[in-house]
């Protein structure tokens, strides 16, 4: 009985050597192996997933970089009128002009590289200082600011043809003929008569209608009757005489023993009036529109 109890007791050697114990040990070994295999599989799957995520992140970063580059290229088209871009273009143009004008190489005019570690406050203060002058320059050049004065876009140039449809499209100045001028003068006379309530208005000499004599190829004026007008002393057949030229007259000079200075002989008033009357041009009052002109 005691042997039976000892055999059935949990700490007995029979239990250790029993097949059930060996089976439990083998199952534990199998479970540990399966656990290690599953752990290795899970680690492999995790590594694969992490590699996939890393590859995806790399592809995303590459895509974002390409997109940012494309955006930058696209924005360069619209940065054409920005202040910084215009300054760089003006500087490059000035350098090119100096090189072409004086034949210097670029290394003498190459400015030192600007450090990118400038603070934003410094750049903002400079932009605020120059904003007023930049805006005034842009308004003078016909441009308009957008977005807090950062970007400048050119205004559409309104052509002079689009301003009013009544203007003629030809750029040559509009000239009136003599007939049109006479018609406009008659219309102005009629309007003035209606406004003042008078029928007959005495116009000044500058506004009176004058029949201009037709000039022939010889330069002689011919009136409407066909009569040849008389030529005055100032106008000769060869051409008009210069009024500044005085007629050469030889005056008799009187000498006296008391005074050594030569003096011309004074003529009488009657002889002087006869000379002036002979010098004055013969003008017909009926033919000339301005009447008789008295020489001063």
Swiss-Prot record:
Enumerate composition-biased segments (Polar residues): 245-261
Q: Which UniProt keywords apply?
A: Methylation, Nucleus, Phosphoprotein
How does it get modified after it is made? Phosphorylated. Phosphorylation at Ser-111 and Ser-113 mediates the interaction with spliceosome proteins.
Positions bearing Omega-N-methylarginine: 141
Task: Give GO terms for biological process.
Answer: spliceosomal complex assembly
Q: Where is the composition biased (Basic residues)?
A: 32-125
- Specify where it is mainly localized: nucleus
The record's listing under InterPro entries reads: RSRP1
Basic and acidic residues bias: start-end ranges: 156-165, 272-287
Q: Where is the composition biased (Low complexity)?
A: 20-31
Q: Name one GO cellular component term.
A: nucleus
Is Nucleus a UniProt keyword of this protein? yes
Modified positions (Phosphoserine) are 12, 111, 113, 280
Give the location in the cell. Nucleus
Q: Where is this region: Disordered?
A: 1-131, 156-175, 217-296
Q: Please name the PANTHER family in this protein's record.
A: ARGININE/SERINE-RICH PROTEIN 1, ARGININE_SERINE-RICH PROTEIN 1
For this chain, the family text in UniProt reads:
Belongs to the RSRP family.
Functional description taken from the UniProt entry: Probably acts as a spliceosomal factor that contributes to spliceosome assembly and regulates the isoform switching of proteins such as PARP6.
Q: What is this protein called?
A: Arginine/serine-rich protein 1
From what organism does this protein derive? Macaca fascicularis (Crab-eating macaque)
Organismal lineage: Eukaryota, Metazoa, Chordata, Craniata, Vertebrata
List the gene name: RSRP1
């Amino acid at each position: 009985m005691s042997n039976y109890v000892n055999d059935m007791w949990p700490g007995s050697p029979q239990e250790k050597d029993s097949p059930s114990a060996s089976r439990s040990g083998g199952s534990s070994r199998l479970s540990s192996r399966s656990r290690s295999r599953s752990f290795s599989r899970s680690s492999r799957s995790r590594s694969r997933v992490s590699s996939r995520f890393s590859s995806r992140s790399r592809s995303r970063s590459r895509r974002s970089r390409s997109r940012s580059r494309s955006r930058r290229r696209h924005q360069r088209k619209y940065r054409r009128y920005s202040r910084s871009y215009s300054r760089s273009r003006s500087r490059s143009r000035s350098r090119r002009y100096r090189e072409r004008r004086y034949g210097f190489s670029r290394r003498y005019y190459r400015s030192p590289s600007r450090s990118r570690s400038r603070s934003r406050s410094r750049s903002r203060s400079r932009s605020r200082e120059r904003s007023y002058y930049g805006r005034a320059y842009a308004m003078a050049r016909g441009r308009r600011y957008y977005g807090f004065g950062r970007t400048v876009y050119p205004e559409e140039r309104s052509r002079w043809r689009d301003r009013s449809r009544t203007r003629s499209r030809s750029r040559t100045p509009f000239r009136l003929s003599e007939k049109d001028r006479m018609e406009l003068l008659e219309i102005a006379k009629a309007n003035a008569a209606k406004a003042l309530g008078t029928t007959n208005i005495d116009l000044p000499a500058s506004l009176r209608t004058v029949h201009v004599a037709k000039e022939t190829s010889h330069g002689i004026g011919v009136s409407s009757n066909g009569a040849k007008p008389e030529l005055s002393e100032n106008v000769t057949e060869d051409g008009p005489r210069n009024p500044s030229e005085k007629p050469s007259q030889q005056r008799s000079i009187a000498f006296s023993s008391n005074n050594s200075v030569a003096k011309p002989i004074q003529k009488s008033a009657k002889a002087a009036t006869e000379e002036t009357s002979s010098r004055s041009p013969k003008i017909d009052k009926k033919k000339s529109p301005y009447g008789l002109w008295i020489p001063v």
